[in-house]
Swiss-Prot record:
Residues 12-26 have a biased composition (Low complexity). Residues 1-26 are annotated as: Disordered. This is Capsid protein. GO terms for cellular component: ribonucleoprotein complex; T=3 icosahedral viral capsid; viral nucleocapsid. Keywords: Capsid protein, Ribonucleoprotein, RNA-binding, T=3 icosahedral capsid protein, Viral nucleoprotein, Virion. InterPro entries: Coat_Ilarvirus, Coat_Ilarvirus_prd. Pfam families: Ilar_coat. Its main location: virion. Capsid protein self-assembles to form an icosahedral capsid with a T=3 symmetry, about 29 nm in diameter, and consisting of 12 capsid protein pentamers and 20 capsid protein hexamers. Binds to the to the 3' end of the nonpolyadenylated viral RNA and is involved in viral RNA translation initiation. Probably binds RNA and plays a role in packaging. One of its GO terms (molecular function) is RNA binding. Belongs to the alphamovirus/ilarvirus capsid protein family. It comes from the Viruses. It is found in: Virion.
Length: 237
């Protein structure tokens, strides 16, 4: 009596499994499963994934419709933001101090020349300034009755007052406050003897008070502390 042995390694079970897979796949009677079809490059399975011309046309029409109705983002306007000007610090090193002097009013004149104030005139009469004083900065502020330019000029002697140099001069507007911080480089007074602040007004050069200054501030080397004479408290006949 023959007995059929059921087991995974028996040939009869393999034949039964192949038959079941063939029956499950009605499209191809040869391939066992999808992996077998890929290995064989079976045309019966490949036809399932083939895209027809109608499908391509429909996909192209759908893409064209989506593109036509898609919202295109509008470009955002670019607004330029001006950077604030760096503000100069008024703090000084420990070896420097500020001294100040009130500016005098300008009188009327009979000629249309430029206006100049020599640096030695600006610092004249300030008690803290001496022969050994070093000058580091000069601050000025003013309002003029006309547009024009101003700057610090070297070599101002006599009655001839040149225009402010192109490099280093600044412009100002009529009836608008303008200020400037001049760097003096720690020089002594005799080294700044021929230096002056020059104004070149476009019009109304002969009027009184054509330029009204807010005063002068000068950064100088710290003066030696004041001490009374040694014999100040010595009583004598």
């Amino acid at each position: 009596m023959n007995t059929l042995i059921q087991g995974p390694d028996h040939p009869s079970n393999a034949m039964s499994s192949r038959a079941n897979n063939r029956s499950n796949n009605s499209r191809c009677p040869t391939c066992i499963d999808e992996l077998d079809a890929m290995a064989r490059n079976c045309p019966a399975h490949n036809t399932v994934n083939t895209v027809s011309r109608r499908q391509r046309r429909n996909a192209a029409r759908a893409a064209a419709y989506r593109n036509a109705n898609a919202r295109v983002p509008l470009p955002l306007p670019v607004v330029s933001v001006s950077r604030p000007q760096a503000k100069a610090s008024l703090r000084l090193p420990n070896n420097q101090v500020w001294v100040t002097r009130k500016a005098s009013e300008w009188s009327a004149k009979t000629v249309d020349t430029n206006d100049a104030i020599p640096f030695k005139t600006i610092v004249e009469g300030i008690p803290e300034i001496g022969a050994e004083t070093k000058f580091f900065r000069l601050l000025i502020g003013f309002v003029a009755v006309s547009d024009g330019t101003f700057g610090m000029v070297d070599g101002v002697t006599g009655d001839v007052i040149p225009d402010p140099p192109v490099v280093g001069r600044l412009g100002f507007k009529k009836n608008t406050y303008r200020s400037r911080d001049f760097d003096l480089g720690g020089k002594l007074l005799n080294q700044l003897d021929d230096r002056a602040v020059v104004w070149c007004l476009d019009e109304r050069r002969r009027e009184a008070k054509r330029v009204q200054l807010a005063g002068y501030w000068i950064a100088i080397s710290k003066p030696a502390p004041l001490m009374p004479p040694e014999d100040f408290l010595v009583n004598q006949d």
